[in-house]
């Protein structure tokens, strides 16, 4: 099976006309959820993907609201709750220099400029102005690292290693 990448998690339905509420797990929701694009639904207890074509997309608060071709009512989409939306690797587009996909960053080891290993990036949050990386260390505690130039000094995707400058108060 072709490699697939998460682009969103379905958290609920929205209204009665078959709209679903999605938390995007991609930096490119406008591109991924463009009308006519294909996504693949992996329902909570299923390993077999369902191919879906996006009929509409709009933003509402912190969510992406989607409708799919062939789905016209809440009764048809309720089963999708807690499902994951994915795209095939062939659907990925080339990025500019120093731009990265979430799946390239997640799993990287974070070290400080003085060589101290902080842990592995397990999640990327997108609260607003910049992404925030969740780093879990050997102590199982989570550290939140902002993806800003003052902090992130080097990203080496091939070695899965990211070097950061620890600003005062960052790890307190």
Swiss-Prot record:
In the UniProt record, does the keyword Metal-binding occur?
A: no
Sorted alphabetically, the keyword list is: Chaperone, Cytoplasm, Ribosome biogenesis, rRNA processing
Its organism's taxonomic lineage begins at: Bacteria, Bacillati, Bacillota, Bacilli, Bacillales
Reported function: An accessory protein needed during the final step in the assembly of 30S ribosomal subunit, possibly for assembly of the head region. Essential for efficient processing of 16S rRNA. May be needed both before and after RbfA during the maturation of 16S rRNA. It has affinity for free ribosomal 30S subunits but not for 70S ribosomes.
Name-wise, this protein is Ribosome maturation factor RimM
Gene name as annotated: rimM
One MF term in the entry's GO annotations: ribosome binding
What the entry lists under HAMAP family is as follows: Ribosome_mat_RimM
GO terms under cellular component: cytoplasm; ribosome
Describe, as the record does, how this protein assembles with itself and its partners: Binds ribosomal protein uS19.
Positions of the PRC barrel domain: 96-170
State the compartments where it is located. Answer: Cytoplasm
Superkingdom is: Bacteria
For whether the record's keyword set contains Chaperone, the answer is yes
| Coarse class of the protein's main subcellular location | cytoplasm
> What SUPFAM superfamilies does this protein map onto?
PRC-barrel domain (SSF50346), Translation proteins (SSF50447)
The domain-related comment in the record is: The PRC barrel domain binds ribosomal protein uS19.
The UniProt entry's sequence similarity note says: Belongs to the RimM family.
The record ties this protein, via Pfam families, to: PRC, RimM
A biological process (GO) annotation for this entry?
rRNA processing
Q: Matching PANTHER family, A to Z?
A: RIBOSOME MATURATION FACTOR RIMM
């Amino acid at each position: 099976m072709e490699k697939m990448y998460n682009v969103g998690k379905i958290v609920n339905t929205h209204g009665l006309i078959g709209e679903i509420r999605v938390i995007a797990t991609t930096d490119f929701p406008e591109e991924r959820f463009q009308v006519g694009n294909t996504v693949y639904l992996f329902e909570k207890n299923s390993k077999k993907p369902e191919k879906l074509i996006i009929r509409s997309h709009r933003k509402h608060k912190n969510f992406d609201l989607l409708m799919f071709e062939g789905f016209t009512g809440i009764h048809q989409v309720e089963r999708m709750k807690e499902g994951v939306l994915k795209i095939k690797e062939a659907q990925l587009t080339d990025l500019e220099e120093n731009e990265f996909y979430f799946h390239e960053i997640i799993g990287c080891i974070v070290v400080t400029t003085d060589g101290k290993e902080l842990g592995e990036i397990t999640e990327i949050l997108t609260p607003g102005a910049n992404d925030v990386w969740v780093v879990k260390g050997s102590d199982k505690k989570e550290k939140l690292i902002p993806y800003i130039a003052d902090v992130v000094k080097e990203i080496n995707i091939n070695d899965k290693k990211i070097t950061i400058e620890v600003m005062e108060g960052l790890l307190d």
